[in-house]
């Protein structure tokens, strides 16, 4: 049972700031707006600190070692595709073969990372590792505007919102990720509509 009075008393301004930055970041992504990457930088840095304080080592490393440079890379890729903020990089899908390859790459990555984290005293090492591995895949596919990246974010947001963050008593972030779960579903539907016809499949 959640003690909401205690949760509000222990509310971290840092966690609130991270949640706001992340919410804006994802909303802009749903709208296919290039400024998603700027807010992504703020979100990554703030949540990196939040996860570090909570001893979620895989998630901390994910923020600083992968997400942060990927924000710069994603920004560059989208800018290169077109000069305006509503850029011209097309929304596409993975080929069936590429989907299999990415799945086969993601699951062993999660298993290996979970095994390594089990020696570090990390909290929730296996689920943290799974979230990290799926996030790595999702972020790369997002950078290249592959519709399948929304499936990754649906899974990640569900694992964070229903399992990982509540167990660390990060209630604001838990609520945020449940909201992000809804936004990910909306983003998936919006991008499917925006993709248009005929649909294209390009390997990555």
Regions found by a protein language model. Give the residues of each.
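Membrane-water interface of transmembrane alpha-helices
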Residues: 65-83, 192
């Amino acid at each position: 049972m959640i003690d909401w009075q205690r949760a509000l008393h222990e509310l971290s301004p840092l966690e609130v700031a991270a949640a706001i930055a992340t919410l804006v970041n994802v909303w802009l992504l749903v709208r296919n707006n290039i400024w998603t990457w700027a807010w992504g930088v703020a979100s990554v840095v703030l949540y990196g600190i939040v996860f570090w304080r909570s001893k979620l080592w895989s998630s901390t490393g994910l923020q600083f070692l992968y997400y942060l440079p990927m924000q710069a890379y994603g920004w560059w890729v989208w800018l290169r595709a077109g000069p305006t903020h509503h850029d011209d990089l097309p929304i596409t899908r993975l080929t069936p073969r590429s989907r299999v390859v990415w799945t086969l790459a993601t699951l062993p990555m999660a298993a290996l990372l979970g095994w390594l984290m089990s020696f570090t005293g990390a909290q929730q090492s296996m689920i943290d590792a799974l979230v990290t591995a799926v996030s790595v895949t999702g972020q790369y596919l997002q950078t290249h505007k592959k519709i399948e990246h929304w499936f990754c974010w649906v899974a990640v947001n569900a694992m964070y919102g229903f399992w990982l963050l509540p167990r660390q008593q990060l209630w604001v972030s838990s609520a945020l990720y449940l909201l992000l779960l809804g936004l990910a579903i909306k983003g998936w539907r919006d991008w499917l509509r925006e993709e248009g016809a005929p649909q294209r499949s390009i390997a990555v």
